Amino acid sequence: MANANSPKSSTPLGEGVPPRVRFCPSPTGNPHVGLVRTALFNWAFARHTGGTFVFRIEDTDAARDSEESYEQLLDSLRWLGFDWDEGPGVGGPHAPYRQSQRMDLYKDVAQKLLDGGYAYHCYCSTEELDTRRDAARAAGKPSGYDGHCRELSAEQKAAYEAEGRTPIVRFRMPDEPITFTDLVRGDITYLPENVPDYGIVRANGAPLYTLVNPVDDALMEITHVLRGEDLLSSTPRQVALYRALIELGIAKSVPEFGHLPYVMGEGNKKLSKRDPQASLNLYRERGFLPEGLLNYLSLLGWSLSADRDIFTIDEMVAAFDVKDVNPNPARFDLKKCEAINADHIRLLDVKDFTERCRPWLKAPFANWAPEDFDEAKWQVIAPYAQSRLKVLSEITDNVDFLFLPEPVFDEASWTKAMKEGSDALLRTAREKLEAADWTSPESLKEAVLAAGEEHGLKLGKAQAPVRVAVTGRTVGLPLFESLEILGKEKTLARVDAALAKLTA
């Protein structure tokens, strides 16, 4: 057998070869933001270099994979604005792009690895492996597979099979160090004692991820593998396997690897897909803009410039180079994510903003009757709302006072604003508002300011009871513009209702 670690087995990529990258998630559960960050960096790299973005589905885990998760994954990627050059719904020269439909390919490659001496059958039972592993640990030695079945004779194999043992297939790792240059982390070397032979096919004949992932990359001619740091330790295994596949004529080259930094959650722990803030669906349901979320995720390991956090996806694509990715862990900061999304909301054309808010202006989010929604009022209030929101879902609570017959009082807001003397202030404010010019927010402001002065209050203190009386909350859109849009009759009626509640 040829040495799978020999330099001649690694064919370098030719100059000017357009990169081919892949994104290959498993359809299990809800998509998470770490997965999106990986997709984003691969997609941006492909678009920046004029390369090919391959979307592949790793659906060989029948117990965990589901068609529902698969459809949700496709929908999420489309919502984010990702397009792919090859993959589900698009096709391509290396179809099919679902691993569950490629099983015969993997079995064929596994047999070629066996025939070429790059792999072998292992008959060790789980109990035997555990016993030898424990003994190695006790002796202070590496606890990986010890090569027990590496050189079995035909007689030994026959004896094991006579016992009813069904073997797995293990890949034979070279007895030399494996070095590769990581695009993010530089040169990395693994010693042979730390990378033992590993399983590639289960005893039932099912190929493992350790085989199918590199085989698909080889057959699809992937040139760059950009993935999470958690997969770094598997890279020497895959490099050795690629070299074997090259010698078998299956692969053309070993791809370049770039391992992206961990995304950290709270408490200095890696953000897990089980963490509530990791779920992509959460951000979509809250009304994050795709461009705002992607802008923030791009900052988890990369930056456009030291003094600029807000940019478009086109600007990111124009500047993105995987070699600029920072290898240090990146912390997910929800408040910063919201702030960046708020900036992107403000960058929208007003008409675009009004349309993107539509889902939150009707059931199940809106708490008003459909017939009470007033399109004309919505069009007028929208620009004021646009400058205040962090996420689109906040629009409902900010404008409900316009469409409800009467405000829904937030109890905390009522307690905070309606202090002793608020009834007298509201009576004075009502008188002055009734006499004000209702075509001018400035006139309404002057009315409340004058009412406050009569009671020894500055505008901020004077307007708080008025705001709660009319909108039900202490915080909201610009008050006097809101009063003008609501109208004189409804505003005064709500002040009267608040006075009745105060004096009840």
UniProtKB/Swiss-Prot annotation:
CDD domains in the record: GluRS_core
Entry's localization field: Cytoplasm
Cite the Pfam families for this sequence: Anticodon_2, tRNA-synt_1c
Q: Which GO terms describe its cellular component?
A: cytosol
Instruction: Return the cofactor note field.
Output: Binds 1 zinc ion per subunit.
Q: Reaction catalysed by this chain?
A: tRNA(Glu) + L-glutamate + ATP = L-glutamyl-tRNA(Glu) + AMP + diphosphate
Q: Where is this motif: 'KMSKS' region?
A: 270-274
Fetch the InterPro entries from UniProt: aa-tRNA-synth_I_cd-bd (IPR045462), aa-tRNA-synth_I_codon-bd_sub2 (IPR020751), aa_tRNA-synth_I_cd-bd_sf (IPR008925), Glu-tRNA-ligase_bac/mito (IPR004527), Glu-tRNA-synth_I_codon-bd_sub1 (IPR020752), Glu/Gln-tRNA-synth (IPR000924), Glu/Gln-tRNA-synth_Ib_cat-dom (IPR020058), GluQ/Sye (IPR049940)
Keywords linked to the UniProt accession: Aminoacyl-tRNA synthetase, ATP-binding, Cytoplasm, Ligase, Metal-binding, Nucleotide-binding, Protein biosynthesis, Zinc
Task: Map motif 'HIGH' region onto the chain.
Answer: 25-35
GO MF terms held by the record: ATP binding; glutamate-tRNA ligase activity; tRNA binding; zinc ion binding
Q: What class of enzyme is it?
A: ligase
Per UniProt, where does ATP bind?
A: K273
Q: Main subcellular localization, coarse class?
A: cytoplasm
Cofactor(s) this protein cannot do without: Zn(2+)
Q: Which residues participate in Zn(2+) binding?
A: C122, C124, C149, E151
GO terms of biological process kind: glutamyl-tRNA aminoacylation
Function of this protein?
A: Catalyzes the attachment of glutamate to tRNA(Glu) in a two-step reaction: glutamate is first activated by ATP to form Glu-AMP and then transferred to the acceptor end of tRNA(Glu).
Self-association or partners: how does it assemble? Answer: Monomer.
Q: Which family does it belong to?
A: Belongs to the class-I aminoacyl-tRNA synthetase family. Glutamate--tRNA ligase type 1 subfamily.
Task: Specify the protein name.
Answer: Glutamate--tRNA ligase
Q: Which organism is it from?
A: Streptomyces avermitilis (strain ATCC 31267 / DSM 46492 / JCM 5070 / NBRC 14893 / NCIMB 12804 / NRRL 8165 / MA-4680)
The coding gene here is gltX
